[in-house]
UniProtKB/Swiss-Prot annotation:
Species the sequence originates in: Xenopus tropicalis (Western clawed frog)
Keywords noted in UniProt: Metal-binding, Repeat, Zinc, Zinc-finger
Keyword Zinc-finger: yes
Protein family membership: Belongs to the DEF8 family.
CDD domains reported for this sequence: C1_DEF8
UniProt KW Zinc-finger keyword: yes
ZnF region ranges: Phorbol-ester/DAG-type: 134-185, 364-424
A GO term, aspect molecular function: zinc ion binding
Region (Disordered): 14-44
Cystine connections: none
The encoding gene: def8
GO BP: lysosome localization; positive regulation of bone resorption; positive regulation of ruffle assembly
Name of the protein in its database record: Differentially expressed in FDCP 8 homolog
Pfam families for the chain: C1_1, RH_dom
Physiological role: Positively regulates lysosome peripheral distribution and ruffled border formation in osteoclasts. Involved in bone resorption.
Length: 443
């Protein structure tokens, strides 16, 4: 009898997880059942509790497969957001007009309303897509690649965890971290405000940041208490260890002012921004640092090659063979080279410094010149004959030994043009023709 009593008590304490009917009879409120009074908490027969998120994170398993349905969280979040919006409105009305605190409150109100709108919108037809704060998150299918979550800074175990990547800025995070993201996609900043910080490490000090991380506002200090402060060499601001992983990148201001391409430590946000801006031609070197051309010979060579390519472009646009051969597509990676000669991207400066751009651009320049001067009879027919010396060789405006009249675009030998710089025969002829056609007009 004593053994039977122990067996009954054992069965009462250790429930069969697959015996749903018996469990429903014994536990009418399975989600929030108070511990039995018959068995104290310290009793070895008590049912163990497994609701310990800290322990789960220690094991590296951050997915909660026993959480409540998404709809329950959604309703709660919408109610909290509406309450926060009303409180933010009241705060804006109470703050002084045009104050910094009021401006910050307005920005916070905008983000709250955007978040509420995102929750109210119906779900996408494609379940693998999530749109948050202009991020376009796609569910990753890779199970073997291991990355770090940009939000919680822990490993993403693709075999047992669901994770997403933003197609705009390559932001990676767990599925559970999606709703915790507060930073908009940096691609929106690149689209609306495509410019660099041109001051070298513009530091303002931790006091200007209220001793908080510039991105997530976590308290930080240079003494690592409560958290280590890490400086971003691009923005000059300080960040916590979750927002600054000691990534390194080339700083545009150092490259332009010092011709220094040594990578420096930057925050995660700055690294993503610099990566997106790397190929954008937003640097006008003549205005930012015109003296750079006096000290960097490679820049002068590249500028001459680009000027020649712009002079070749009209020949290709009006040449059927060149259009069929798609010669201009050889510069499709640097489209700005066929549009202007003074805009550069940071990638251009990197390639100039390493010598790669000079070699590749010289080959393209040779191919273009060969088509115009040797391969294509139509392009050859558009050449010029020097009207000053009357020699028979055909001249083109991109030849190194020629000069071009600024008024009529006629091409002459450089020596002939400078020896007779007082007058251009073609300009004189055109002026006489105008006088004959319009005798009443003054030349």
């Amino acid at each position: 009898m004593e053994y039977d009593d122990k067996l009954v008590r054992f069965r009462q304490g250790h429930l069969n997880p697959f015996d749903k009917q018996g469990e429903a009879e014994r536990q009418p409120a399975a989600c929030e059942t108070e511990p039995s009074k018959d068995f104290p908490t310290s009793s070895p027969l008590s049912v163990p509790e497994f609701h310990c998120p800290d322990r789960v994170m220690d094991l590296g398993v951050s997915e909660d497969h026993f959480s409540r349905p998404v709809g329950l969280f959604l309703a709660s979040d919408i109610q909290q957001l509406r309450q926060a919006i009303e409180e933010c409105k009241q705060e804006i009305l109470e703050l002084p007009e045009h104050s910094d605190r009021q401006k910050d409150a307005v920005v916070r109100l905008i983000h709250l309303r955007l978040k509420l709108q995102e929750l109210n919108d119906p779900l996408e037809d494609e379940p693998n897509l999530r749109i948050l704060l202009e991020h376009r998150f796609y569910k990753e299918k890779s199970k073997s690649v291991k990355h770090l979550c940009d939000k919680c800074s822990t490993f993403i175990w693709g075999l047992i965890q669901t994770w997403y990547t933003c197609t705009g800025c390559s932001y990676r995070c767990h599925s559970k971290c999606l709703n915790l993201i507060t930073k908009p996609c940096v691609r929106s900043k690149v689209s609306h405000q495509a410019e660099y910080e041109l001051s070298i490490c513009p530091e303002a000090g931790l006091d200007s940041q209220d001793y908080r991380c510039a991105e997530c506002r976590t308290p930080i200090s240079l003494r690592s208490v409560p958290s280590e402060a890490r400086q971003c060499d691009y923005t000059g601001q300080y960040y916590c260890i979750s927002c600054h992983w000691n990534d390194i990148a080339v700083i545009p201001a150092r490259a332009i002012h010092n011709w220094d391409f040594e990578p420096h430590k930057v925050s995660r946000c700055s690294m993503r921004y610099l990566a997106l801006m790397l190929g954008r031609p937003v640097l006008k070197l003549r205005e930012i640092n015109p003296l750079l051309f006096n000290y960097v010979e490679e820049l002068v060579e590249i500028r001459k090659l680009r000027q020649d390519i712009l002079l070749m472009k009209p020949y290709f646009i009006t040449c059927k063979e060149a259009m069929e051969a798609r010669l201009l597509l050889q510069l499709q990676d640097r489209q700005h080279f066929v549009e202007n000669d003074d805009m550069y991207s940071l990638q251009d400066l990197l390639d100039i410094s390493s010598g790669r751009l000079g070699c590749s651009l010289t080959e393209i320049h040779t191919t273009f010149a060969k088509h115009i001067k040797l391969d294509c009879e139509r392009c050859q027919a558009k050449g010029f004959v020097c009207e000053l010396c009357k020699e028979g060789d055909i001249l083109f405006p991109f030849d190194s030994h020629t000069s071009v009249c600024q008024d009529c675009a006629a091409v002459f030998h450089r020596d002939c043009y400078y020896d007779n710089s007082t007058s251009c025969p073609r300009c004189t002829r055109l002026n006489l023709r105008k006088q004959v056609q319009n005798p009443g007009e003054e030349p």
